[in-house]
């Protein structure tokens, strides 16, 4: 029977919604519960994720969170100096912020603080108000999309057939599969998608390393403004030259070292050399200065002006001495017009730091270099001690980013195109699974407290997702290539290139380890 026979269906629906959530800009008359009294807490409320004291961009999705305080119901008020506050009355601890008023509030408060007031209704009928959370809206936006890899953790990596490259619209919660490998499909068995990289944050110029289970090939797939090329040579870690004419790559042979007690695993790279792939001539060159027979070279990255190639280099020791291998940060001058290389320079020595160095990434203005340091090896993902460091390339001074790091592994970082944001993967949430975090990098060269990639009900999303999210790369728009494009390039390429060898070469093997094994 109709409980409200004299009311229209839209009005009846509205009445059911009003007690739960409302935003004040809507003009809906929602009344919070009647309370017997109020009390004030001197402390901040405990919320998950920890969105307290963070700086976020004006174009980020709502920072939904869960209140980890007892209460029969909750009141939340999000406000700034300008614009209309967002008010939410909820019977559940999950706080879902309406996206339209959230966007309007952030836009009205660029460069200004945003406060969050949380109150909990106790069983006594008393409303307990916590101290106000103060965050800050940066004036500069972040690139609109994030591209990352999702894969199952460690030994169950192919459960539910999950390894793939995804993109996420940072202004909302839309995630899109770019390519997903379903291992339970016999045609895909043994197939893997791995390192991906973009040319200066452009979504339509990218390279992707793959392994094709049916053929055993490990090609690099280049998507360049709609043209798809499958390069039939095993490349590892990739880096675009700023001109877009070249790709630096590493040749690696990763193997897993498993332990029965203590640290559960390590990664050993048994073959590290760096080479150059030239797109126009379809040639591969292994410059002798960066493919030395007695050194492991890896983690190539270019300076924004293209005049230097930065990389990491460590002594070539046998696997039994894996804990003794520490990598130095190096660079070498390069002239694109002539193809000439300068001499290798040491930028930062592991003997000076006492730590191994990996994953150098330079800010778009060329002034700062973000990198990882940890006790040994070239792989920070398996090292809980891995932290992010920042070097001022103008002075060569470096510092540990105390505001950013945790007591868990930090790695896989990349810059936004405007240099005001960087994203990285961290295991701080549970010690096992990498999750993407963002940090604001202000005009004074200071990195701010990071925040977790927003999700609808993020506590439930991250706690129930048994996958690592790593290799996060910021891009300025949506990637225009989907599943069909990548599968065709892997299994039935229209444009397949067998690159010609040019100049002196290294004899080091060129293969990656098991798909996803060390890539965490």
Regions found by a protein language model. Give the residues of each.
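Sequence signature of WD/YWTD-type beta-propeller architectures
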Residues: 31-520
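Bacterial N-terminal signal peptides
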Residues: 16-28
